[in-house]
C-alpha cells in the first residue's frame, strides 16, 4: 500500500486530529467521517476500532503499510511493552524529530527537508527520513543560505507548541541534540497503541 497523497482534511475527519499530517483541526460542524453515511451512528466492531488506531499511526507518520509492519516486527523484538516500543521507534525517526523541533510544520514537510539534503546528523548530511535517531545524536540544518532560511521561517510557526523533554534546541545555531528516547507522555498523537499491536497480532 502506497503512502497517502490525497486530501488531508478527509483523513482527519475520519480519524481525528493528526498533528504530524496537518495543522488543520477537524471543523466542529463537520466532525464526522466523510461520505454519504458519515453522520450515521454505527456500533463499531473491535476490528474496526483496531483498524482505526492503526490508520492513525500510518497517516500521522506518513508510512506505507509495509513500513508499519516492519516497525511492528522491530518493536516485538524489544523487551517490555511492544506498543510503547513501536511509538518510540516512530517518534525517533529523523523526519519526526525535525517536525518535533519545529523546523518543519508537518512530518511531510520535514520529510521533504530531509530528502533535499537540508539536514545533518552529527555533522554529516542525512537524506533518509526514516533514519533512526539515538540519544547523543546532534541534529542540525546544513550551513547553506537556503537551508537555514527554510528552517528559520518554519521555527516562527512550529507545528506543535511545546518542545518534548528528550530534545534540546539552539534556535540561533539551528542545532539540536537528542538527549534520550521519547517518553510516552510526549507523544502528541492521541492513539491507543495496544489496539495497533492487537490489530497485527494475527497478521504479522
Swiss-Prot record:
Example GO biological process? translation
GO cellular component, alphabetical, reads: small ribosomal subunit
Does the keyword Ribonucleoprotein feature in the UniProt annotation?
A: yes
Per UniProt, residues of the S4 RNA-binding domain are 92-152
Q: Which residues form the signal peptide?
A: none
Q: Which domain of life is it from?
A: Bacteria
PROSITE patterns for this protein: RIBOSOMAL_S4 (PS00632), S4 (PS50889)
What SUPFAM superfamilies does the record point to? Alpha-L RNA-binding motif
- InterPro entries recorded for this chain? Ribosomal_uS4 (IPR022801), Ribosomal_uS4_bac-type (IPR005709), Ribosomal_uS4_CS (IPR018079), Ribosomal_uS4_N (IPR001912), S4_RNA-bd (IPR002942), S4_RNA-bd_sf (IPR036986)
MF terms per GO, please?
A: rRNA binding; structural constituent of ribosome
The ranges of region (Disordered) come to 25-45
What are the alphabetically sorted keywords of the record? Ribonucleoprotein, Ribosomal protein, RNA-binding, rRNA-binding
Q: What protein family is recorded?
A: Belongs to the universal ribosomal protein uS4 family.
Q: Partners and quaternary state?
A: Part of the 30S ribosomal subunit. Contacts protein S5. The interaction surface between S4 and S5 is involved in control of translational fidelity.
| Biological role | One of the primary rRNA binding proteins, it binds directly to 16S rRNA where it nucleates assembly of the body of the 30S subunit.
User: Which PANTHER family does the UniProt record give?
Assistant: 30S 40S RIBOSOMAL PROTEIN, SMALL RIBOSOMAL SUBUNIT PROTEIN US4M
Question: What name appears for this protein in its UniProt entry?
Answer: Small ribosomal subunit protein uS4
Give the gene name: rpsD
